[in-house]
């Protein structure tokens, strides 16, 4: 077999592969055997008809077609391996020439990973938020917990941020009512600022059964930019009453008997949460700094596939209804052109990161254990709200299991490289990166399990 490689761009090549018939004996034997099993020729048992009769009865065409189909995958892989090509995506294959009993020549255009030099992570320096837990942080966490047990009660005082109002709203442009911006009996939390611009300001200071009127500018939709008159009537005003943070609350909201025990546990949880946030910040900042050190062309077809996948996911959530997508974009104040541009930008960032991490993984050569892969599969299934067994079956049927393996490999490679970077917090203190990304040796792991 002879192969030539033509570089079409930094990210795409064309292989021309010439395979002599002398190397196709196995495929030819298999093709005749397969067709002999499918046909009945008088005087011969099924599968025993000689080649000459098969050629005479059906011609050489079906044999050659079968031979080509059988040999293409293995010969393509052989050509890729022999030329040390780092291909990504599926190839576009064409049969260029076929001379019976002589040779088969095919071409394959395929994207390849661009070449670039991975930066030295030991020369990367980043800053991340300091790991500090204040009493205010603990107070806020306890208040958030208490809010889950809060009750809405009527209030006669003037409303303020955080209160709830049951309201009627009428929005008009040039005297014409806008149904999409008019509501009756709607419950609204003052401070959310997610309905009509100026509504929060208008509601502050109002009481039950009062009316108010204000002008605003429509932010999206058909009347975007138009001045509108908004009339609001408060049916009811309510405030959220939170339980007292005492021992009784601790017993109701947790497994603890006293508020002091609950507070101490809450502090521990806040500290762990801040550690997770710091670890995520380290990962993001180091990766961002590393990516800024390299420049390479992206394979357009891979980016296109990513854009298509993102659109397919969004449309799947909307039952593939283009009208529903248009309504969603209108509600968000976004055009289809802006949506497509954002999708392409996101796809480019994703592909760029994956290609970089693949190159890093080749250098770091991390090993992925079966347990690590299983843990990642379980975590991913959980994030999708799927049964793990069904998720695995779906991965196997769509040949996507290798993608999750690559995800784990990329993550381990990045974790190893991050440990070489210099990380300080905003207070100027050096951060112990190993506590987040360092490997635990087997002795430590066993000791931890025994405890």
Curated annotation (Swiss-Prot):
Which UniProt key words apply to this protein?
A: Cell cycle, Cell division, Chaperone, Cytoplasm, Isomerase, Rotamase
Q: Which GO terms describe its cellular component?
A: cytoplasm
**Which molecular function term from Gene Ontology is one that the record holds?**
protein folding chaperone
Enumerate the Gene Ontology biological process terms: 'de novo' cotranslational protein folding; cell division; chaperone-mediated protein folding; protein transport; protein unfolding
Report which reactions are catalysed by this protein: [protein]-peptidylproline (omega=180) = [protein]-peptidylproline (omega=0)
Matching entries from Pfam families are given as: FKBP_C, Trigger_C, Trigger_N
* PROSITE patterns to which the protein is assigned, alphabetical: FKBP_PPIASE
Principal subcellular localisation of the protein: cytoplasm
Question: What EC number(s) does its UniProt record assign?
Answer: 5.2.1.8
The protein's location, in the record's own words, is: Cytoplasm
Residues of the PPIase FKBP-type domain: 162-243
Give the domain section of the comments: Consists of 3 domains; the N-terminus binds the ribosome, the middle domain has PPIase activity, while the C-terminus has intrinsic chaperone activity on its own.
Stored HAMAP family:
Trigger_factor_Tig
Described by its record, this protein's role is as follows: Involved in protein export. Acts as a chaperone by maintaining the newly synthesized protein in an open conformation. Functions as a peptidyl-prolyl cis-trans isomerase.
Family, per the entry? Belongs to the FKBP-type PPIase family. Tig subfamily.
By what name is this protein known?
Trigger factor
Organism of provenance? Corynebacterium aurimucosum (strain ATCC 700975 / DSM 44827 / CIP 107346 / CN-1)
Organism classification: Bacteria, Bacillati, Actinomycetota, Actinomycetes, Mycobacteriales
Name of the encoding gene? tig
